[in-house]
Amino acid sequence: MKKKPTLEFAKIVSGVFSNKEQALNNPKKFAHIQIHIRPLFFKTYNCFAFYSEQRYQHDIWNPYRQSINKLSQEEEIFIFSNYKIEDKERFTGGALDISLLDKISKYKLYKKPGCSMYFKETNPGNFLGTIESGCKCFIEYGSDKTYVKSKVTVNKNILISEDSGYAIETDKKVWGSEFGPLIFKKIINFDCFINEYWK
C-alpha cells in the first residue's frame, strides 16, 4: 500500500460531518443528520480502519447505521470496505466516546458483500466514490429487500451523499432522498490521529 496517499485520503474521509445548514434551510425536505467516521488504532485490525455511525441529531444515542470500514488502495483507487459488527449495540456511542471501542476487536466482523465503495481522485483533493458494480449490496427496508445505489463526493471540507434503494424484483425506487443529495460539512476532523505513526 502506498502509505502517504492513503494517509492523506484517510484524513479527508474521516471526521464528523453535519448537514445542519441544509436541514435548517429546508426542514421539510431534509432531516438533520450527522456522520461520524472515526479512525481506529492500526493494531485494532492490523489495517487502516474506521468506526462509523450515522444518526439523526435529535436522537444521537440511537444511530441508524453502525459499521467498521477498512481502507485499502489498489493503484489509483481507494477501497472503503464495509463490515457489520457482532453485538453492535455494545459500541453505540463509540463515535462520541472512543473508550467504548476498546474491546471492539474481540467481536466478529461480517463483510457486507457488494457494499464496498471505490474512490478515485477527480481533481486535486476531490474524490468521487461509487458502490461496487453488480447491484449486490442488499438492505432490508421494512418488508422489502432492496439493492443499494450509492455515490459520494468528498474533499477536506464537504461530503455529498446520494443513497437510494431499489426493489430487487421491479427495480422500483423504495427509499432514498426525494429532494436531492445530502450535503454535509465537516465540523470536526481527526487529523491528529492520522500521521506516519498511524500503524
Curated annotation (Swiss-Prot):
GO terms for molecular function: lyase activity. HAMAP family: Chrphore_lyase_CpxT (MF_01460). This is Chromophore lyase CpcT/CpeT. Covalently attaches a chromophore to Cys residue(s) of phycobiliproteins. Its EC number is 4.-.-.-. The keyword Protease does not apply. Belongs to the CpcT/CpeT biliprotein lyase family. InterPro entries: CpcT/CpeT, CpcT/CpeT_sf. The keyword Disulfide bond does not apply. CDD domains: CpcT. Keywords: Lyase.
